[in-house]
């Protein structure tokens, strides 16, 4: 089992939690981005830099992910693709995407895209809070404990 990170948009505080978890559990952690990402020296952590472009990092994750792997992403279409391949998906706020909820999340995302395209200001996600960080850490720990 490996952890894949959609690293371009992943908050730094979440990456730090992931670095520590990878070391603690000796789990391979791969950060995929189309720009340079700093990672600690570790036998468990590596980065993959892909060419710039829309969805290039996402496509690399989908290409490489295996059933049972965990993908960290806030990108709902990416989450849907990796779930379809038998992997797991967790967003940086600690919400697990599953076969039970991913269709509803995709529908809501598409609806919000339609609203934005028609000129409606839908706002954005609130800033990452301590509660979000804790929710992520807790869900990551639950996943790693259950999947060792």
UniProtKB/Swiss-Prot annotation:
Coiled coil: none annotated. This is UPF0178 protein Mlg_1612. NCBIfam families: PRK00124.1 (NF001095). Disulfide bonds: none annotated. InterPro entries: UPF0178 (IPR003791). Belongs to the UPF0178 family. It comes from Alkalilimnicola ehrlichii (strain ATCC BAA-1101 / DSM 17681 / MLHE-1). HAMAP family: UPF0178.
